[in-house]
Amino acid sequence: MTKIVNKFALLLCLLALTASLFAAPEAEYRKLSKAYILNADGSQEFRYNMELTLFTHTAMNGTYGESFIVYNPQYQELKINASYTKQKDGNIVKTPDNAFVEVLPRTAADAPAYNHLKEMVVVHTGLELGATIYLDYTLTSKPGYLPELDIYDELLQTSPVKEYTVSLSVPENKPLAYTLQNINSKPTVATEGGMKTVTWKLNNLPASSRDMFVSAANGDIPFLTASTYASNKEALNGLFAQFTPATDVQLNAIAENLTAGKKNDTEKLQAILQHVVENVGYSQVPLRDAGFKIRSINDLFYSAYGTEAEKTNLLNGLLNAAGIQAETAASYRVNADPASLGLNAIKELVVITHADSKQYIMSPTSGKMAAAGWNNQTPVISLTNAGTPVTIPTPDARINYEVSVSVSPEKAESQVKATISDAYLPYYGDNIAAYAGKETSSQTLKANNGYVMVTLPDAPVSLAHSSYCHMNTARKENLLLPCKANEHYAYTVTIPAGMKLATPESVKTIENGAGKVVISIRQNGDKTEVERSLQLNKQLYSPAEFSNLRNLLTEWGNQSNKILLLSVD
């Protein structure tokens, strides 16, 4: 009888797995169209058209119940050409006037200077299973508001797309560079009435992945970049021209005040970075929604907040005013033809400098090294030095712990000697010693049924504490890890009389094409020696390599490998 029950349970599990693998999508875009138009007078139009059929209650009540359009009414006009729902029986339900709701975009909530921005929320009505949502709108920008046609678009949507049309239209004498990558499609090019139009027609695009850590930077997500700037250099120059020079009187006064009494460039840099990160609020208004413009340093001083670009301007200016030569650079989302990379394709702005022979790659929103310092998959290009590529050396990812643990019936005291690469360490703050150097910690022990558990300390920045150690068994996309991990921990645990090691001695080694993990426990007299090490061969892994990588990371993230069980007499 037990065998029958077990077989039945196994069958149910297999059926559930099959259902999840071959489950129908929540919805499907029957048609999706995006048209980007740059007119001869400098005005721009964006035309969006979709037909979306709903298949599930989640799609109807949550995922696709509303559409959102952010725009600047001072310089842009939004026109809803059509908005209605076609129900399964053919009945048409037009979107009523009170279903068009204007709100403040979430990104502008704490930024009064950007409270003029609007977000049109289109509440779709008449929804039911099998209904199709129709939405067609045009967003027109006045001449000069957007400097050039500047596009970055990841093509996969949250549901499959049956027919997807993307077109770019510019005056025929205007330069147009574009990159369509990770999807096989050739555009058609037509010229009529002095306008050149480039069109892609794509069919049967799958839904975007819901796996963790999926990014176009990983090199396998379809995307489009396009730009009518004469060059990438010109695009960056247009942004950098708005930056405040280090000779600015107010900038110099602030820099002098922040660095007063500091003994060296490192202390000056730390004071300036801490001020920009902690004392100047961060507004998440994207550069595009700000019209690719930034407010002045003076506005930042009086408002005490800024966008990423505005805070970058402040950080760059203060460092240079303090005599620390700094360079601003743009880190891009993807690796594409540089000519097609405008400002929309920028992932983050960073400030790079050296202080007392140490390189700093700084974000104006974080006290740690900017993400660009870890990621060498996409280009980093200088604003300061007119579009020159910036070479960022691969960071040292080594972590080495030597730990002596002294156990008594009441507690376990650990003496840690940590060597952690500078790349992991915060650039300022009193807690740097908690990451590297010497540290003492104590753990209270309480016997339970004649046993106590001793937890072995490890680095707070260890990959073992990340979600990378808890991923699904299969993956269809590339995986870019935050670093090429190289961690080693050696523990010497002194066990007193009256207590014995209950964890079995063992040596576990997993070595494959992705790297190597070693977990060993050995008894040596009254001491127990534990070794844990992880070494990965690279940072970017393909789906074919994922199984090997997951085996290593799952073992590395297993918390039981950091616990010793001791018996108490």
List PLM regions with ranges.
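Positively charged n-region of N-terminal signal peptides that target proteins for export
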Residues: 1-7
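Bacterial N-terminal signal peptides
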Residues: 9-20
